A protein has these predicted regions:
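Periodic small-residue-enriched repeat registers in elongated scaffold domains
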Residues: 1-164
Length: 165
């Protein structure tokens, strides 16, 4: 779907769906499917095992719920969620939210990001910070003494806010 508020859906095995207009949505429900939404405030969802979802517009959201799925959100204030077992979720936009499931990995390259902590999960925070010095912070569920579902906001590698579920 290429117009504003359009939607696209693929339900077969290895299908793909793409929505490029503002507020568009794309969904792929078959195993190994992919979904992409590139417009402002778009959403993409892949629910099959090893599926991938990507949202590139500002405020977009991407979700992959199958095992070993991946989700990516590259716009500011976007969110990425890969809740299946061993999934990966990546955000690059400032003030975004990232979440992965058990034994998964969540990654962000934004200076300020919120991680939704899950047991066994790892969060990798690559940030630039002041004076353009690139740094890396690796946080674990256990190491942060998090509660399942707790929203932990990092700014330049430091925890600045914690919100219990």
């Amino acid at each position: 779907a290429t117009r504003a508020s359009g939607s696209a859906s693929a339900t077969g095995e290895r299908g793909s769906a793409s929505a490029t207009g503002g507020s568009g949505s794309a969904s792929a429900t078959g195993g190994s499917g992919s979904a992409s939404a590139t417009g402002w405030s778009g959403s993409a969802s892949a629910t099959g095992g090893r599926g991938s979802a990507s949202a590139t517009g500002w405020g977009g959201s991407a979700s992959a719920t199958g095992g070993s799925g991946s989700a990516s959100a590259t716009g500011g204030s976007g969110s990425a969620s890969a809740t299946g077992w061993r999934g990966a979720a990546i955000t690059t936009g400032e003030y975004s939210t990232v979440e992965c499931g058990k034994d998964g990995i969540a990654v962000s390259t934004a200076d300020e990001v919120t991680w939704i902590a899950r047991p066994g999960a790892v969060f990798v925070h690559r940030y630039e910070g002041i004076r353009s010095t690139r740094s890396l912070k690796i946080a674990t569920f256990k190491g942060t003494k998090a509660t399942d579902g707790e929203r932990i906001t990092f700014k330049c590698g430091k925890i600045v806010k914690r919100v219990m579920p």
